[in-house]
């Protein structure tokens, strides 16, 4: 993050604008909306600024910039067509530790103006850090079409009710749940219809009904790593959570999407290394929910595919706590897709089998005879530790030693690492594989060299297109 987003209170604060042309006028009109006390340093004013001056909207010094003009001002904006003068304004501001903006000359700016969506008191600011202003404008236009016009009045009413809600609901978590329900329920629906009086009545009724004290648990699949693969429902629950218990397999990019003030607890597991025993995780889920909290159990991939999600929900259900499950893209689907390996193919594989290489009791309970049959794909989770045994057993039971295999490390992440080879060399590949890693066995692996795409093309352009097309 190159620039820290800040919202400045400019009401009755002096702001110096150097320049009296149309560019300065556009900045001044924006400053006026924020209530700034505007001072203009320029020998002449364009018609638009002269009109504002006559209406009492600005003070005009009527002379060229002098450093002394920076005394006792809050911000300074240079908006002239004289590059040397603009640079001088910036340098003088820097010497006085004042924030300065030089229009269309980012190197001389200590702050920049974002693209703005105004639904006052809701304001959305979008910035490309000065690198792609056209992209920022396109994003603003897209969001303008998505964000409803009633957001401003709804926020104003919510602000007027904050004091009453705080008096009636003492806990911060309780107040947050009240507002989440109101802003996603009847109150918001009435606001959308323009029925302001009825909307306030709905707030009154909700407040009189009292806060909801019951906690709940949401078991959410975080997907294989790329935050773009997270489901919308999962994101919504992560943004509403009071506390999030997450595993090591959840990527930092996904964790970054958790609500900022939610408590985060690492309940991670790696092979041979458990930061928290499974029974303790089960107990903690129940305890936190019984405290009235919204708990998200965030697990890599899909929580019901080798994620012990079923075990955890058994404990939650036994305690009588409400719960829900949000599926995630499992690693076998996500990692292979990003590696250009289709799990099934009419010419190579008519079935796919998911296998765990880490059995609960450590015993060999796999049907190797069935797994060694051809024309199927094997996706083995946590298989690198037992790669030698897997290779040996499959070959012993009839699978060709030349069967193509892949070991995919950090699948779907920017540092994804794919190794390919044959079944007889699986152990050597596994020894070089960073974890977490997925083992894929089958003829479909050979297609990796034809249709591998991730990291091979201009992904920056692809991702930008997906962001721009929000609607």
Swiss-Prot record:
InterPro entries reported for this sequence: 4pyrrol_Mease (IPR000878), 4pyrrol_Methylase_sf (IPR035996), 4pyrrole_Mease_sub1 (IPR014777), 4pyrrole_Mease_sub2 (IPR014776), CobA/CysG_C (IPR006366), NAD(P)-bd_dom_sf (IPR036291), Siro_Cobalamin_biosynth (IPR050161), Sirohaem_synt_dimer_dom_sf (IPR037115)
What does it catalyze?
Answer: uroporphyrinogen III + 2 S-adenosyl-L-methionine = precorrin-2 + 2 S-adenosyl-L-homocysteine + H(+); precorrin-2 + NAD(+) = sirohydrochlorin + NADH + 2 H(+); siroheme + 2 H(+) = sirohydrochlorin + Fe(2+)
Q: Where are the transmembrane segments?
A: none
Tell me one GO molecular function of this protein: precorrin-2 dehydrogenase activity
Give binding positions for NAD(+): 22-23, 43-44
Where is the catalytic site? 247 (proton acceptor), 269 (proton donor)
Any keyword Oxidoreductase? yes
Where does this protein hold S-adenosyl-L-methionine?
A: 224, 300-302, 305, 330-331, 382, 411
Q: Which UniProt keywords apply?
A: Cobalamin biosynthesis, Lyase, Methyltransferase, Multifunctional enzyme, NAD, Oxidoreductase, Phosphoprotein, Porphyrin biosynthesis, S-adenosyl-L-methionine, Transferase
Q: Which residues carry this modification: Phosphoserine?
A: 128
Role description: Then it catalyzes the NAD-dependent ring dehydrogenation of precorrin-2 to yield sirohydrochlorin. Finally, it catalyzes the ferrochelation of sirohydrochlorin to yield siroheme.
**PANTHER family under this entry?**
SIROHEME SYNTHASE, SIROHEME SYNTHASE-RELATED
What's the name of the protein?
Siroheme synthase
Its source organism is Sodalis glossinidius (strain morsitans)
Q: Please name the taxonomic classification of the source.
A: Bacteria, Pseudomonadati, Pseudomonadota, Gammaproteobacteria, Enterobacterales
């Amino acid at each position: 993050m190159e620039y820290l987003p800040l919202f400045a209170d400019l009401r009755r604060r002096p702001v110096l604008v150097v320049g009296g042309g149309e560019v300065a006028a556009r900045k001044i009109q924006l400053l006026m909306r924020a209530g700034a006390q505007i001072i203009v340093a320029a020998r002449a004013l364009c018609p638009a600024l002269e009109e504002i001056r006559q209406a009492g909207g600005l003070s005009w010094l009527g002379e060229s910039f002098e450093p002394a003009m920076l005394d006792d001002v809050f911000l300074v904006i240079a908006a002239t067509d004289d590059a040397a003068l603009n640079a001088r304004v910036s340098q003088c501001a820097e010497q006085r530790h004042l924030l300065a903006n030089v229009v269309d000359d980012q190197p001389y700016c200590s702050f920049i103006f974002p693209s703005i969506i105004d639904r006052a008191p809701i304001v959305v600011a979008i910035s490309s850090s000065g690198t792609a202003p056209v992209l920022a404008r396109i994003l603003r236009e897209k969001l303008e079409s998505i964000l409803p016009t009633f957001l401003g009045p709804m926020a104003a009413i919510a602000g007027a009710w904050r004091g009453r809600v705080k008096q009636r609901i003492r806990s911060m978590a309780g107040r947050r749940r009240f507002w989440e329900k109101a802003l996603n329920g009847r109150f918001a629906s009435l606001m959308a219809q323009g029925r302001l009086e009825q909307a306030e009545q709905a707030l009154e009724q909700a407040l009189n009904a009292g806060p909801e004290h019951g906690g709940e648990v949401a078991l959410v699949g975080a997907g294989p790593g790329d935050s773009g693969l997270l489901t919308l429902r999962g994101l919504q629950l992560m943004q509403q959570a009071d506390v999030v218990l997450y595993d090591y397999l959840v990527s930092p990019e996904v964790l970054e999407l958790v609500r900022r003030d939610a408590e985060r607890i690492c309940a991670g597991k790696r092979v041979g290394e458990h930061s928290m025993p499974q029974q303790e995780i089960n107990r903690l889920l129940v305890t936190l929910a019984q405290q009235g909290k919204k708990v998200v159990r965030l697990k890599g991939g899909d929580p019901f595919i080798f994620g012990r999600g079923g075990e955890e929900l058994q404990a939650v259900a036994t305690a009588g706590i409400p719960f829900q499950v949000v599926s995630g893209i499992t690693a076998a689907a996500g990692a292979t897709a990003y590696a250009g390996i289709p799990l099934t193919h009419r010419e190579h594989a008519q079935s796919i089998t998911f296998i765990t290489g880490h059995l609960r009791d450590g015993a060999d309970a796999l049907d190797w005879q069935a797994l060694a049959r051809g024309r199927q794909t094997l996706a083995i989770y946590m298989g690198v530790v037992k790669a030698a045994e897997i290779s040996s057993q499959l070959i012993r039971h009839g699978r060709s030693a030349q069967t193509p295999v892949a070991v995919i490390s950090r699948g779907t992440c920017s540092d994804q690492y794919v190794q390919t080879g044959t079944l007889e060399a699986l152990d050597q590949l596994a020894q070089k594989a960073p974890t977490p890693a997925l083992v894929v066995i089958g003829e479909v692996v050979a297609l990796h060299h034809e249709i591998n795409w991730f990291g091979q093309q201009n992904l920056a352009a692809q991702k930008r297109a997906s962001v721009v097309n929000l609607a």
